């Protein structure tokens, strides 16, 4: 099985940050990415389990993968075009 998290185009370390900081940083980072590029987000705030998927839905980006069974949480999103 391929590890989807192994080769993102960009990585955002949001460990230790609390809502709303992680999603604000994701928004700023994604804004500077090209369509089709991927972003790995590493976080430990439980609010990200709802905020990151919600951000992807609202902004129409693809939530490629998420791993929220244990800490740290990992999310891989692809910027829409």
UniProtKB/Swiss-Prot annotation:
One of its GO terms (biological process) is tRNA wobble position uridine thiolation. Sulfur carrier protein involved in sulfur trafficking in the cell. Part of a sulfur-relay system required for 2-thiolation during synthesis of 2-thiouridine of the modified wobble base 5-methylaminomethyl-2-thiouridine (mnm(5)s(2)U) in tRNA. Interacts with IscS and stimulates its cysteine desulfurase activity. Accepts an activated sulfur from IscS, which is then transferred to TusD, and thus determines the direction of sulfur flow from IscS to 2-thiouridine formation. Also appears to be involved in sulfur transfer for the biosynthesis of molybdopterin. One of its GO terms (cellular component) is cytoplasm. It holds the Pfam family TusA. It is found in: Cytoplasm. Its main location: cytoplasm. This is Sulfur carrier protein TusA. It comes from the Bacteria. The gene is tusA. Pathway: tRNA modification. The active site is at 19 (cysteine persulfide intermediate).
